[in-house]
Amino acid sequence: MTEKIILASGSPFRKAMLINAGLDVEAVPADVDERALEAPLQDSGVSPEDVALVLAEAKATEVSERRPGALVLGCDQTLSLGDEVFHKPADMEGARRHLLALSGRTHQLNSAAVLVRDGKVLWRHVGIAGMTMRMLDPGFIGRHLALVGAKALASVGAYQIEGEGIQLFEKIEGDYFTIVGLPLLPLLAELRTLGAIDG
């Protein structure tokens, strides 16, 4: 028996990951102003990992209020380079700036998942991956962005490792699912513990 999971997100990629794992999923996008929640957290020195957890919890809690009794999953991912937190680039120039800043350096992807039922947090987890980009020539960055187009605007790092973006990297440390935005293995383990999925 599988309980329906309400995904507090409009992300087709996260929904597809959950469906591919055999879960019964309904997407209900959260109505949360992420930047308004995030700004005071960053100003007070909250870690990028904890920012991701707070945002994931806010999304799950907001949707949980609209879906009484449902098991709601909230997710968020932050990218940090030292103390700097990156957001999805707004345009191709922003994507170019992201890749120039990340070139030759190691950044961290922090993927948070939170399960909530009736406003009560049942579980929270953040997976962390270290991503080392190779040194990128500005000309190569321009050609790469021309190749991938608007896909560069769909992720916080302006790349998708499941596609052409893998060519940007020298070394990756961490779980694939964490890198693409959802710590799936720990989530599945918790869903089994809760009896929400068979296992």
From Swiss-Prot:
Keywords: Cytoplasm, Hydrolase, Nucleotide metabolism. This is 7-methyl-GTP pyrophosphatase. One of its GO terms (cellular component) is cytoplasm. Gene3D superfamilies: 3.90.950.10. Its cofactor is a divalent metal cation. It comes from Mesorhizobium japonicum (strain LMG 29417 / CECT 9101 / MAFF 303099) (Mesorhizobium loti (strain MAFF 303099)). GO terms for biological process: nucleotide metabolic process. The active site is at residue 76. GO terms for molecular function: nucleoside triphosphate diphosphatase activity. InterPro entries: ITPase-like_fam, Maf-like. The lineage of its organism: Bacteria, Pseudomonadati, Pseudomonadota, Alphaproteobacteria, Hyphomicrobiales. The keyword Iron-sulfur does not apply. It catalyses: N(7)-methyl-GTP + H2O = N(7)-methyl-GMP + diphosphate + H(+).
